[in-house]
Amino acid sequence: AKAFRVNMERIDWKVAALHWTPEFDYPDHVKLLPTSIKVLDEEMGNCGDYLLILYLDKDKLVEIGTKGIMNFPQGYYVYIGSAKRNLEQRIRRHRHLRKKMHWHIDYLRQESEFIGVIPIRTKRDFEHLLAAAISDIADWEIKGFGCTDCSCKSHLFGFYENPLHIKAFTKIEENFEINILNSYFDA
C-alpha cells in the first residue's frame, strides 16, 4: 500500500464497484467509482483495529494478570483490539506464544490455539463499535476482559462455532472493512 501511494501519480489506476456472490459468479456489471487520495491517506496506514480469533479445546481456568483466575468455556473466542500505530507488529505479536505478558489477551493466548486475525486498517477508531456489533451475535462474553480503558462490557466474545463460518460475523467484517468506505463517496 505504501509503495502504491508513493507511485500512484505515475499509475493509471481505477476503483471499481462490482456485485459479488458467495459463489464468486462473474459480475454482470461493473461501475467505476470516483477516486480519492484522501481515502488512501486515511485508510492505508499501519494502524487500525483487529479481530483476533482463538480456540480453546476444553474449558480452562486461566490466570489473567491482576484480574486473577478466570473461567473460559470451550469454544472459539474473538478478541477486539486496536493499534493506533504498528498494527502489523501487534498482529504478529498475537501469533506467537513466547512474549512478555502485557494485555489480558496475552494470558489467554498462551492457553489457546491461534485461528486467525482480521485486520481493519483505518485511522478511525472502530474498536468499540466492533465490540458492540460482535456482542450482538456472540454466544457469550467474558465480562470486563480487555476493556479496562473504556466503558464496553467486554472485548472478548465466545462462540460455539467457528465465527469465520457464521454469516452474521462475516457481514460485520464486510461492513467494517469494505462498506465503511462508502462514507467517503456518499453525497
Regions picked out by a protein language model, each given a short descriptive name:
Residues L156-L164:
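Residue- and microsegment-level detector for short, conserved "hotspots"
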Residues L97, R109-Q110:
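Function-critical acidic carboxylates
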Residues E111-C152:
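Mid-chain, well-packed structural core segment of small domains
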